Amino acid sequence: MPGHPRDATLTALLRRELVREEHPPTAALIRALAGIHARGAFTRAEFKLMCRWKSPRARHLWETNSPARIRAVSRAVLATRSERRRMELLTGLHGVGVPIASAILTLIDPRRYGVLDIRAWQLLFSLRSVTTNARGQGFTIAQWEQFLSELRRHARHLRVSARTIEYTLFLCHRKFQRGLLYARSERRLRRSNTAV
């Protein structure tokens, strides 16, 4: 059971808003990737599907990874028991930052992982479950580890997957958000409004 007073608000929110149904296209992708663990690696085509799901705009970067490099990295990721090492290996691929790496792990094993996303992070920050990076941008591996720990703790308490917790946080943030998501976008919008 979560033990910090700050957890009461988050636990109540999660209980009230818990989303047990996966987004249908995401559920289909997770099913399509189900054989990865048995093979012990993912293909370049699977890698591209996972990256596109999280960040299609970075395509020009992650598409430059060779099939051999992707295969070697994916084998090492699936072979190690170290969460930090998994993240280090994945972020060693061109165009793969911590959010995309977290998405890859989530799509492969949604029971244990959730996507590190600006929305989920900002909601956790507003509830003081995480205490750094208020904007939820430029994530570090240490922040991902903290995020993952929070997801897993609440997942155990509510007897659901880490992905269920993360997806619920994502949708709650979307539901309750005020203003623009990215601070840089707000500044750009203000500048363009003053120029008119």
What are these regions, as identified by a protein language model?
Residues 52-96:
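Helix-hairpin-helix/helix-loop-helix acidic hairpins
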